[in-house]
Amino acid sequence: MTSSVLTPSLKLLAMTNSSSSTLFCIPSIFNISSSESHRFNFSLSSRPVNLTLSLKSKTLRNSSPVVTFVSQTSNWAEEEEGEDGSIGGTSVTVDESFESEDGVGFPEPPEEAKLFVGNLPYDVDSQALAMLFEQAGTVEISEVIYNRDTDQSRGFGFVTMSTVEEAEKAVEKFNSFEVNGRRLTVNRAAPRGSRPERQPRVYDAAFRIYVGNLPWDVDSGRLERLFSEHGKVVDARVVSDRETGRSRGFGFVQMSNENEVNVAIAALDGQNLEGRAIKVNVAEERTRR
């Protein structure tokens, strides 16, 4: 008499371990089948199962590679193992292709497409900056610079567009663009590993103006625009803290002649700027020790 016995038929179920991103298999439940003998038949191929692994990552900064797992749990145990080692002609693939260290794989955007973005509101982070510049094209890299000690934005950052044309469009669109009451300064970033040579500043003390009690969000560009209404501004600079990059609340403006200095002082000394009465007077030349 034919007896019914439990013949464990192993179905391979693809599973992933999120902590190590590995694939492994476990047996399925027992299937009832007929057999003449009272023994358990385990049918497992001794041939290795090839799992093709590949990972796809996009050239992004400050993000980890995206790992996409594709698994299939159809009746693999009922299908024959293929000649290539796959089960029933079905393979489990995890696509993994990293960019090599020398940049081969995904082309780097041109350096000319990297932009400096200054006078950022302090609550704008890298994601918000990227979303803003996407109006001009594809943003490859977006980075707001933070103070390492306070973890606060230093009020500037960098955006790399996909092409030089998109970078030029972004400069045209966003330079002097107002965000949360602040006008952005957008221009080409200096090439990697180099800095533009600064011309030595020659000040005539008679034409140099001290500006005090400035609002904290006033930068050099805004200071220049304020004084340009009263003459030709040769140079304008808000003094910043070396450690934090924040304004120290005062700066200096150099006009082109003495008459413009007098006009600017008369017009702006004591004027209200964002609720603060600014102090404007002739800068005193420091005695060098």
UniProtKB/Swiss-Prot annotation:
SUPFAM superfamilies: RNA-binding domain, RBD (SSF54928). ADP-ribosylated by the Pseudomonas syringae type III effector HopU1. ADP-ribosylation reduces the ability of the protein to bind RNA. Residues 1-71 form a transit peptide. GO terms for molecular function: mRNA binding; poly(U) RNA binding. Keywords: Chloroplast, mRNA processing, Plastid, Repeat, Ribonucleoprotein, RNA-binding, Transit peptide. InterPro entries: Euk_RNA-bind_prot (IPR050502), Nucleotide-bd_a/b_plait_sf (IPR012677), RBD_domain_sf (IPR035979), RRM2_NsCP33-like (IPR048289), RRM_dom (IPR000504). GO terms for cellular component: chloroplast; chloroplast envelope; chloroplast stroma; plastid; ribonucleoprotein complex. One of its GO terms (biological process) is RNA modification. Residues 113-191, 207-285 form the RRM domain. Disruption phenotype: No visible phenotype under normal growth conditions, but mutant plants exhibit multiple specific editing defects in chloroplast transcripts. It is found in: Plastid, Chloroplast. Required for specific RNA editing events in chloroplasts and stabilizes specific chloroplast mRNAs. This is RNA-binding protein CP31B, chloroplastic. It comes from Arabidopsis thaliana.
